[in-house]
């Protein structure tokens, strides 16, 4: 790290913040932005409170790979100076945001959790980071990612139980928000890298529709599958971030040249009772018994608002198709770097590249056709329902450092559908 945090301390929970930091860091981003806009607190005060919380918890949680407190405070002071000069506050004015270390940042290295990219210093921000800065965010630091946003874990631990995984690959972003270090962070998902960590760390995670947020300047695993999303402490905060990040970018081939939805306005609109489909996918048997029982009980409590639907066997090949697409694309996009790096990469990543390199064009194209068919099938289902209710993970975060099973995220990533983790149940 660029900043040495306090040494780890014994115990299974991250230590609590000092009282001042605890008071301010308990605010959601929406609340903090309002307090800053009204002049009740300054951007510097709020950033300092977050840094104090980071100093208290980082030795245990290990969510950050690069952080520079003085640089963060300089950003905050510059934002306060703008306000003193009479300039209006921007949507994220003075709000610290953590950046998964696969997104280019002109002021921090971007190493993608891999020795292959050690000391890599981008010359410009990724589109997502540039939009955050333009909205007044304080880019507080880079959060830990698993190696090349794949399975091999980094050092991050679950803030609610240090013996358990935070999930991955967006490990640091989910853990930092879950630990109360920062109110917001960005991550990415190519299989289950946002929805699962959000579930394990007890925060809101929102992966919007494929192409909603630009991936320009982020590590490319698979253009067909890569999504950018957000971690937050409330749905209102997710909407705030989406209003900043969503929108067309000509440098992302999957970005759509159409007006982005107004997420905060939609969130504030009183909605009628939704029609929910409680969906059991072909991997339903992989859920822990406690998860199955809890969701079935939830569906019963919802009564007529939720209809139980078992997806047909025509969806069963989706998990194999996702694997073919992801592995083939990753082998194409950085297989050469992995081969040149030799033992610098984990065996997991080398095995992925080897498998992906063996897939034929015919098998790859069949998997892409499958993805379109699954999406069409789900679109037909959603003509009768407003949303799908289904687990974000098989169960609670596993012990140890393995990042957990993404099986309950795969289908929604493969089909590009939006997904949000709601921290409703606790193990």
What are these regions (language model features)?
Residues 40-48, 77, 262, 289-311, ...:
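Acyltransferase
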Residues 124-248, 413-426:
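Short glycine/serine-rich loop segments
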Residues 9-11, 16, 207-293:
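A short helix-breaking turn/cap at a secondary-structure junction
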Residues 92-112, 265, 270-279, 324-379, ...:
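Short helix-loop capping/hinge segments that flank enzyme active sites or metal/cofactor-binding pockets
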Residues 72-74, 82-153:
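Acidic/His- and Gly-rich active-site-bordering loop/insert found
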Residues 1-73:
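An N-terminal boundary/leader segment
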Residues 39, 94, 100, 134, ...:
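Glycine-rich, small-residue loops and helix-cap segments
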């Amino acid at each position: 790290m660029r900043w040495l945090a306090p040494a780890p301390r014994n115990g299974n929970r991250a230590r609590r913040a000092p009282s001042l930091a605890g008071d301010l860091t308990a605010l959601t981003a929406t609340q903090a932005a309002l307090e800053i806009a009204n002049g009740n607190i300054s951007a510097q005060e709020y950033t300092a409170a977050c840094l104090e919380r980071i100093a208290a918890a980082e030795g245990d949680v290990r969510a950050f790979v690069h952080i520079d407190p003085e640089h963060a405070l300089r950003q905050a002071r510059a934002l306060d100076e703008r306000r003193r000069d009479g300039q209006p506050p921007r949507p994220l004015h003075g709000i610290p945001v953590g950046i998964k270390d696969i997104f280019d940042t002109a002021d921090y290295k971007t190493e993608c959790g891999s020795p292959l990219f050690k000391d890599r210093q981008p010359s410009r921000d990724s589109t997502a980071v540039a939009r955050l800065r333009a909205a007044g965010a304080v880019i507080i630091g880079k959060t830990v990612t698993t190696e090349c946003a794949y399975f091999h874990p980094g050092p991050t631990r679950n803030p609610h139980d240090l013996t358990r995984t935070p999930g991955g690959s967006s490990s640091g972003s989910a853990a930092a928000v879950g630990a109360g270090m920062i109110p917001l962070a960005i991550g990415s998902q190519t299989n289950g890298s946002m929805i699962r960590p959000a579930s394990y760390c007890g925060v809101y995670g929102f992966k919007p529709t494929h192409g909603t947020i630009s991936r320009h300047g982020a590590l490319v695993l698979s253009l067909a599958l890569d999504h950018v999303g957000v971690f937050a402490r409330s749905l209102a905060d997710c909407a705030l971030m989406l209003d900043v990040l969503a929108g067309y970018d000509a440098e992302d081939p999957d970005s759509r040249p159409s007006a982005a939805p107004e997420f905060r306005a939609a969130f504030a609109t009183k909605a009628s009772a939704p029609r929910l489909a409680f969906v059991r996918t072909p991997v339903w048997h992989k859920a822990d018994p406690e998860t199955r029982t809890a969701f079935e009980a939830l569906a019963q409590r919802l009564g007529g608002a939720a209809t139980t639907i078992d997806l047909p066997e025509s969806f069963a090949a989706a998990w194999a198709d996702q694997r073919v697409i992801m592995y083939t694309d990753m082998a194409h996009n950085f297989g050469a770097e992995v081969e040149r790096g030799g033992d610098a990469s984990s065996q997991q990543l080398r095995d992925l590249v080897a498998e992906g390199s063996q897939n034929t064009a015919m098998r790859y194209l069949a998997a892409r056709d499958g993805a379109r068919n699954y999406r069409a099938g789900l679109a037909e289902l959603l003509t009768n329902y407003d949303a799908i209710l289904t687990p974000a993970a098989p169960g609670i975060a596993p012990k140890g450092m393995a990042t957990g099973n993404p099986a309950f995220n795969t289908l929604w990533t493969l089909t590009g559908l939006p997904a949000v983790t709601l921290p409703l149940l606790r193990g």
